[in-house]
Regions:
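Conserved hydrophobic/aromatic positions in well-ordered beta-strands
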Residues: 35, 49-51, 119
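Short, positively charged
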Residues: 42-55
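Short, conserved beta-strand element in jelly-roll/cupin
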Residues: 68-76, 119
Length: 124
């Protein structure tokens, strides 16, 4: 799917009451998907979600995608990448971008966070 066809994909407004709370791929957190294009199937090109990080945990791998994490609520999270980099995502609305295949571990600063997560395939 290219960006032009993605922009012409049918869409709909989803009420927040209809968001499904689902476990992360690795089972160590929660997410509420708010947009997926295309809307059906597992072969998406763009995905927007809000994650709840409740404990220090490894992040799920999403090879071939560009990820971003934007702090919406909470005292922040420290991301430790396998290559030694550390990114602190702190209030009010700290953010970080990274490749989906990067191995990383999140450490909560002080309590649960809610984070906005735009994720898209890098070939778009």
């Amino acid at each position: 799917m290219n960006i032009d066809s993605l922009l012409h994909t049918p869409s709909q407004v989803i009420s927040s009451l209809d968001y499904r709370r689902e476990r992360w791929r690795n089972g160590l957190g929660w997410t509420r998907e708010i947009l997926r294009l295309p809307a059906q199937g597992d072969d998406w090109a763009l995905r927007l979600s809000v994650a709840e990080i409740e404990q220090d945990a490894a992040f799920s791998a999403f090879p071939g995608v560009e990820r971003e994490l934007v702090l919406l609520q909470g005292n922040g999270v420290r991301l430790r990448f396998a290559d030694g980099r550390v990114a602190e995502v702190l209030p009010p609305h700290g953010r970080v971008r990274f490749a989906g295949e990067e191995a990383l571990h999140g450490e909560l600063v002080d309590g649960t966070t809610h984070d906005f997560n735009p994720v898209s395939y890098t070939h778009l």
